Amino acid sequence: MIYIDNRQNSITVDENLQNTIREVIDYALKEEGMKISYEVSVIFVDNETIREINRENREVDKVTDVLSFPMLEYGEGKVFKDIYEECDFEDEYFDEGNLVLGDIALSLERAEEQSKEYGHSFLREAAYLTVHSVLHLMGYDHMVDEDKIKMRKREEEILSHFDINR
């Protein structure tokens, strides 16, 4: 189950955008080994709102493009597909039979700005940021170079399925 909640007025949210976000999330999760029903919540926000969320949750008082709030914890250097087969998730991780993976806050305003900066479509930028965030929900990180390389490679592999390349 993918919930999308539009909490901004800066960018028009049409059916194509919502469908693309849903398809990208579903495909990325399946590629990462998701074999059971899941739940991901996505909120579309503006720059000021994502700045507030960033400040409240990370103590970073600046605008960012996307924030991920994973519900599951993974061991150091582990991602979902590394632990899924041996993991017995407790009831607290489920809601109505769906494994709750976490929340994504996506600034559509910042995605629009970045699409212009990088010279590609808004839809491509929104899709990229969604894949990036989903991978965080699945345990990927980019704090050290080795992990960053692994994550970037995975992002591009997933996006290539949609013919949405950089």
UniProtKB/Swiss-Prot annotation:
Q: What is its main location?
A: cytoplasm
Kindly state a single biological-process term from the GO annotations of this entry.
rRNA processing
Question: What are the annotated GO cellular component locations?
Answer: cytoplasm
**Top enzyme class of this protein?**
hydrolase
Residues the entry annotates as binding Zn(2+): H132, H136, H142
EC identifiers of the protein: 3.1.-.-
> What does the record's cofactor remark say about binding?
Binds 1 zinc ion.
- Subcellular location per the Swiss-Prot or TrEMBL entry: Cytoplasm
Report the cofactors.
Zn(2+)
Similarity annotation = Belongs to the endoribonuclease YbeY family.
Instruction: State what this protein does.
Output: Single strand-specific metallo-endoribonuclease involved in late-stage 70S ribosome quality control and in maturation of the 3' terminus of the 16S rRNA.
- Matching HAMAP family: Endoribonucl_YbeY (MF_00009)
Q: Sorted alphabetically, which PANTHER family does this protein's record hold?
A: ENDORIBONUCLEASE YBEY, CHLOROPLASTIC
Q: What is this protein called?
A: Endoribonuclease YbeY
Q: What does the record give as the organism's lineage?
A: Bacteria, Bacillati, Bacillota, Clostridia, Eubacteriales
Q: Which gene encodes it?
A: ybeY
